[in-house]
Amino acid sequence: MSNSVVHNLLNRGLIRPLNFEHQNKLNSSVYQTSTANPALGKIGRSKLYGKGLKQAGRSLVTETGGRPLSFVPRAVLAMDPQAAEKFSLDGNIDLLVEVTSTTVREVNIQIAYTSDTLFLHWGAILDNKENWVLPSRSPDRTQNFKNSALRTPFVKSGGNSHLKLEIDDPAIHAIEFLIFDESRNKWYKNNGQNFHINLPTERNVKQNVSVPEDLVQIQAYLRWERKGKQMYNPEKEKEEYEAARTELREEMMRGASVEDLRAKLLKKDNSNESPKSNGTSSSGREEKKKVSKQPERKKNYNTDKIQRKGRDLTKLIYKHVADFVEPESKSSSEPRSLTTLEIYAKAKEEQETTPVFSKKTFKLEGSAILVFVTKLSGKTKIHVATDFKEPVTLHWALSQKGGEWLDPPSDILPPNSLPVRGAVDTKLTITSTDLPSPVQTFELEIEGDSYKGMPFVLNAGERWIKNNDSDFYVDFAKEEKHVQKDYGDGKGTAKHLLDKIADLESEAQKSFMHRFNIAADLVDEAKSAGQLGFAGILVWMRFMATRQLVWNKNYNVKPREISKAQDRLTDLLQDVYASYPEYRELLRMIMSTVGRGGEGDVGQRIRDEILVIQRKNDCKGGIMEEWHQKLHNNTSPDDVVICQALMDYIKSDFDLSVYWKTLNDNGITKERLLSYDRAIHSEPNFRGEQKDGLLRDLGHYMRTLKAVHSGADLESAIQNCMGYQDDGEGFMVGVQINPVSGLPSGYPDLLRFVLEHVEEKNVEPLLEGLLEARQELRPLLLKSHDRLKDLLFLDLALDSTVRTAIERGYEQLNDAGPEKIMYFISLVLENLALSSDDNEDLIYCLKGWQFALDMCKSKKDHWALYAKSVLDRSRLALASKAERYLEILQPSAEYLGSCLGVDQSAVSIFTEEIIRAGSAAALSSLVNRLDPVLRKTANLGSWQVISPVEVVGYVIVVDELLTVQNKTYDRPTIIVANRVRGEEEIPDGAVAVLTPDMPDVLSHVSVRARNGKICFATCFDSGILSDLQGKDGKLLSLQPTSADVVYKEVNDSELSSPSSDNLEDAPPSISLVKKQFAGRYAISSEEFTSDLVGAKSRNIGYLKGKVPSWVGIPTSVALPFGVFEKVISEKANQAVNDKLLVLKKTLDEGDQGALKEIRQTLLGLVAPPELVEELKSTMKSSDMPWPGDEGEQRWEQAWAAIKKVWASKWNERAYFSTRKVKLDHDYLCMAVLVQEVINADYAFVIHTTNPSSGDSSEIYAEVVKGLGETLVGAYPGRSLSFICKKNNLDSPLVLGYPSKPIGLFIRRSIIFRSDSNGEDLEGYAGAGLYDSVPMDEEDQVVLDYTTDPLITDLSFQKKVLSDIARAGDAIEKLYGTAQDIEGVIRDGKLYVVQTRPQV
């Protein structure tokens, strides 16, 4: 209708104005008046409306009368491929009809009138037909009216009513309708006739209308601009170009001339130009658009390889890591109360004399079924219990194989049993003794092993209770390796949140929509619980994703409802990701298990598209119909696998084994297909002529499925970010995804490069492209973005593709040299660092690999030795990450798994599977490939022998040496320990410790091994280690050399060999002289004597003034022997002393837990005023800073450090060590050496006789960055080690480069060193047993060795190492015996902080 007509009608007051959304888009010739269509004059023949409807010319009237209105429609050219027509009913009611005239044919009808009983009475017109037909697709609540018309109710919206029809049958070329208000019995017509709406058809479009190519190019460009300048592949480019041609043909069919189109397009195009270009001539602009058909592309990448950008790797460091905090809420500390069933089961298990063979809990709504099996002497006992409130009958049988029901023998039937055909009905026995509520039970005992299982279902009244539409089944042939445990306390978890999840699981299992909405509701609570809250959500979602939880139970849900719930959850997770950087790694993992979700249209496509596939390919029955029903009922990630299995089946020329292989490889069995609410019974059985069409359509459908279910699918993720439009087909809804804004320049080309190389055998270019894409994307992930979720899923997909690519590339590394393997390691490490919250150590490992690669390419000496240190550090980083995951995730997995009845085997390996799913597993595999290559190149061998002693003993395999350090073996034992930290004691009876771990040669455990004549060695070869572990319990002979360990199995007769006699040697006779308080609280170094201080203090005092001038000795004072005993005897400390006496008695009775309590108690000591004054005076007179000058708080820090040194007399290691050699612990006295801390650049330890070889002509030393505590304490990794001949001190030889990730640094401070009378006794190595405590906390710094001149500057390295060797040689000459020396280097100056005789 023209604007003039509307204006006239408004002025005449005949119609009420109505603001429709598209009222400015008036109709084209698609809409016609009744006289333009011959069918309209024959309404009477259709016998649809009765006799009262008569043709009344061209005026619009109603049956009940009304004012006629003249109506003359006009065709108006519209840019938009939609057309709209407005009518007036009764002279004052507006009616608007719009038709979408492109691929999707929709008829939108709006009327400015409302009624609860307003209907559209309608039908369709086929080609050259007059009578109505009923379309197969109609809106909800449509009714069939006498099989001759459809009646569809309008939907009210404000003061208007509206309705949308979707027409998918291409044979329909028009619809006709009337409007009927049932409550008023009133019909609205078009001048007494049907409203007749023509629909565009493919035939119309394909008429031979010629459109100039230059106009098609401009239209294609404008379409591309409208759709957000998306990235198109060649196929999509062609499709868009032809769509542009079709749009222009349609306009010409409506009457537009070529000149009209040209004028309109050029005007439209000009509006997009800058003001500066508006003066360009028409012909110039036309020529410009001829070359603008597609967006310009920057060809940054050739077809073979990309050029990676140079980046400062330190800019990638990400330190947002959540502190591990145990929730402090009351609910977290309270143990979970056992359920009635758990109490019953616990009591039953205690009654049984045999361990539980298998145990399982089936969770039902509001109740549960517990089944456990025990076996003894050929008898199998089955226990079934349930907490159902109403009486229950067990309908059961026995089976010899899965799926069968066999009549049980009559002589084994329990009481209240009634045999029925092929089964038995047994009424359960009600038990309530000592239980909070009644339990119904069943017990069965079977002789022999002829039966393998027991199928059953329950009957309660009129209800049959099954296991998700399948029978329950008790398997008593297969023993559970991990019988489900009860983790009732929930320690280390967000227990309150996990309890809530467990309570809501019965609701969550109804459908994915329920589960995702419940998870979304819990996000705020998870946020409050912190890291452990999101760990709980991850565990729950991971149990879901791995099919440990029920996906759908008695509930139908539309795909669009699932995708909407997904969308809600992932939107919330996206918001948390943006606001809480410390949880990002966990959130990434949660999102990868949930999937992306999408707006309703994306989910709806799952439902619509399968119908189109069935119709187009003539496969409406069998598996396609069953799958269609499942998809409509409750789509899930299984559908991605089913779709892939169908495509693989078709590609294999319909080989059913291929179909089943794809399903089974992805965890879908026949039983699972049958377990769906809409079960899939049939196997595929397609015809040859269906092959091409199904492959094409299922391939397109896979994209729809992955868009909802597969967050980490690369192609889907790229499309979501680059944007795409899919107009659908027939009745399918269209989908338009706009491109993400703000992507880096050239990014589409980079992603196109990735897609083009994603399946190539040579994975190196692909890996480079993937990592470059992740690096380019990273800045956008670190700030807010309206499409952050899509960027995250793209990054997850790129990350996942790196992992799959590297696994595919293992084969090409089989014959590769170390340079290639190192490069691949650096790529995978980069990928892991980009996915980690706390990646500083990983980044420095990455820098180390790049430095090693440069050394290798330059063929520098020691490149392999240096690369080995980086490899060792990388292993440590992986181990640290695994331990972190274990600490955060495993407690939640165990607690929630117990609550939800998850299979124990899935719970026990939960964290392990999480790690395997990431880049860490690929990195570990590559490192293991490279290790033997580097060891061979660097001539390192398979062993490092720390204490070479020949021994014979029985092998025992343990995880950690720490767990057995206080054990006593009654026969010679060779311990193979996966983990040795360096601080442990070696247990009595052990003759050897073998480990893959790498404690320092000078660590406490190394010193103890050498002193105790115990063989101690590190094994670097995983094959040798596995062989040793396989000899658990066997008697072995070990024959170590300085670089190898030869071992063999021997007979018991060889136990008498001299080499193993050290086990029988009695501990040396050692005694301590108890020291007394000499009346002094503090003394200077000049007063150090054996009566007042230990060897540590005396040696420092002795060195002063005797060492070369270039060797510094720190100023020292001491709290002498007896001060501790004097302080604790003071009246002010009476309570502490009394408690100490009680705890010592407890300790003597064997309670080792008292040691920790003693140390804690001693921190309550009060310093006597005399001690404070005397220590202050002594320190100041020795030119040492007095802490109290900086405030009372600083003195309190110093006093706390002194007390910790005294308390270390009762640390576990020291206490058991003195017990082992039968020293009287009460006679052990502790002086405290007080020194100013030198904030070291490096710390070192020297042994002036090589401890590994015993060569006295050779100095051995180790150096670390920062303070020496990382060298002598239990800090992972190796230090820099070197040897130096005493006759050539200027030529140190590096044996190994450092792999310690952490260095300790401290402000100017004071350190309080333990100096007991039990250290350095002949025959007993007491050094290192007791603590030295600085008054300030050290700062832990992650080390970057690529910027350390000790590694990178060979001349600096030579000078520092030579100075250390010369200092050691000078001190040895001063004492005349081999020395164990500790020192530091600060600003090039060397200081010795202590020395003692080398053991």
From Swiss-Prot:
GO cellular component: chloroplast; chloroplast envelope; chloroplast stroma; mitochondrion
Catalytic center residues: 1004 (tele-phosphohistidine intermediate)
Compartments (UniProt record): Plastid, Chloroplast
The enzyme's E.C. designation: 2.7.9.4
Effect after changing residue 1268 to E: In sex1-1; induces an excess of starch in leaves after a long period of darkness
List of residues that carry N-acetylvaline: 76
Catalysed reaction, written as an equation: [(1->4)-alpha-D-glucosyl](n) + n ATP + n H2O = [(1->4)-6-phospho-alpha-D-glucosyl](n) + n AMP + n phosphate + 2n H(+)
Pfam family, one: Ig_N_CWD1
Cofactor entry: Mg(2+)
SUPFAM superfamilies: Glutathione synthetase ATP-binding domain-like (SSF56059)
A GO MF term: alpha-glucan, water dikinase activity
Residues annotated as transit peptide in the record: 1-75
Biased amino acid composition, Basic and acidic residues: 284-306
Subunit structure: Homodimer.
PANTHER family in alphabetical order: ALPHA-GLUCAN WATER DIKINASE 1, CHLOROPLASTIC (PTHR46999:SF1), ALPHA-GLUCAN WATER DIKINASE 1, CHLOROPLASTIC-RELATED (PTHR46999)
Role according to the record: Acts as an overall regulator of starch mobilization. Required for starch degradation, suggesting that the phosphate content of starch regulates its degradability.
UniProt comment concerning the protein's domains: The N-terminal domain contains the alpha-glucan binding site, the central domain the pyrophosphate/phosphate carrier histidine, and the C-terminal domain the ATP binding site.
General remark: The reaction takes place in three steps, mediated by a phosphocarrier histidine residue located on the surface of the central domain. The two first partial reactions are catalyzed at an active site located on the C-terminal domain, and the third partial reaction is catalyzed at an active site located on the N-terminal domain. For catalytic turnover, the central domain swivels from the concave surface of the C-terminal domain to that of the N-terminal domain.
Protein name as annotated: Alpha-glucan water dikinase 1, chloroplastic
Source species: Arabidopsis thaliana
Taxonomic lineage from the root: Eukaryota, Viridiplantae, Streptophyta, Embryophyta, Tracheophyta
